[in-house]
Amino acid sequence: MKVILKQDVKGLGKKEQMVEASDGYARNFLLPKGLAVEATSANVNIMKTKKEAEAQKKEREVAQAKELAKKIKDITVTLKVKAGENGKLFGSITSKDVAEALKTQQKLDIDKKKLVMPDSVKSIGTFDVEVKLYPEINSKFTVKIENL
């Protein structure tokens, strides 16, 4: 019997995959537990439309990420912090600080987890920060740290 899996089934297949299962296994285990549905033409069409919708959603997300990457490329964010005489900061600049500065100065809301900071930003100067917007889509912008 051909069935479409609703979730991963060990030893049989992955979610939304159409597989051949023995009649008894399908009727007595997979269908009653809601792990699969019978592969009728209606269910196959529903699965195809879901996959198409997911593909369109992914394309939109990739397009938005590319657009945001273009915007971010030319940005310079300035942070003013207290520093000692030799240019060393009292503390360090974290991705949280940079994300907040992006939000206030450029009106861009980027999660701090997507920012890849240089090892340690503990002095005054200019640093490049990488943003991982989507798998395979990255961008860089400049962070300028100045003394108060």
UniProtKB/Swiss-Prot annotation:
Pfam families, A to Z: Ribosomal_L9_C (PF03948), Ribosomal_L9_N (PF01281)
Position of the signal peptide: none
GO molecular function, one term: structural constituent of ribosome
Keywords, sorted A to Z: Ribonucleoprotein, Ribosomal protein, RNA-binding, rRNA-binding
The keyword Nucleotide-binding is assigned to this record: no
UniProt GO BP: translation
InterPro entries in the record: Ribosomal_bL9, Ribosomal_bL9/RNase_H1_N, Ribosomal_bL9_bac/chp, Ribosomal_bL9_C, Ribosomal_bL9_C_sf, Ribosomal_bL9_N, Ribosomal_bL9_N_sf
Listed GO CC annotations: ribonucleoprotein complex; ribosome
Tagged with keyword Ribosomal protein: yes
Assigned protein family: Belongs to the bacterial ribosomal protein bL9 family.
Function text: Binds to the 23S rRNA.
Protein name: Large ribosomal subunit protein bL9
Species name: Ruminiclostridium cellulolyticum (strain ATCC 35319 / DSM 5812 / JCM 6584 / H10)
Gene name in the database record: rplI
